[in-house]
Amino acid sequence: WHRALMRLDEGDYDTVLAEYDQSLWDPKSDEYLDLCNDASLLMRLELHGVDVGGRWADVAEKCKARTNDHLLAFIDVHFALTLAAIDAPEAGELYASLAKYGEDGNDDNAPISAEIGKPLAAGLIAYKQGDFGAAVDYMVPVRYALPKMGGSNAQRDLFAMILLDAAIRAGRANLARALAAERLGRMPENAWTRAAHTRAFAA
């Protein structure tokens, strides 16, 4: 997966798609980490402007039956993104279930789901529905709290990319420029970051 991210930044999209199809996507696996990695790579490809074809639908089919699992907020938001990518009604069902779990759950994950999972899932769903302003409004307040949700820095970086792209698309110029400048300071050699910085300051 990390090798695919390196190829992605190099712009070798055909190789990344081939690696996804041949190595990363496992039709037999329902392992949550596999599904999260699949969703993350597909979304990153789209952020790079790559058409991923029908690949979202294959991942979404595995997520549809897991809208009430709530193992980790980190997993739920990836499932929400995947279901929203194909405009599946289960995206809304997952959000409603997640909201209820955040209120009523009695394990350690419930308050994290309420604080971070619920607004982040709402933001990702809004993003996939093309409501970029709403995506920004949901995601900005929780952007610094994401480490509580789990996952590695590389895994969580997807949400920073989506927020920056949403801010640009929503015409939130000041926010987009601030996010882009902050990101460029952290990763000046990253091709997507440089391109997003150019987009933000051209708006």
What is the role of each PLM region?
Residues 5-203:
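Helix-coil-helix junctions within alpha-helical repeat/solenoid scaffolds
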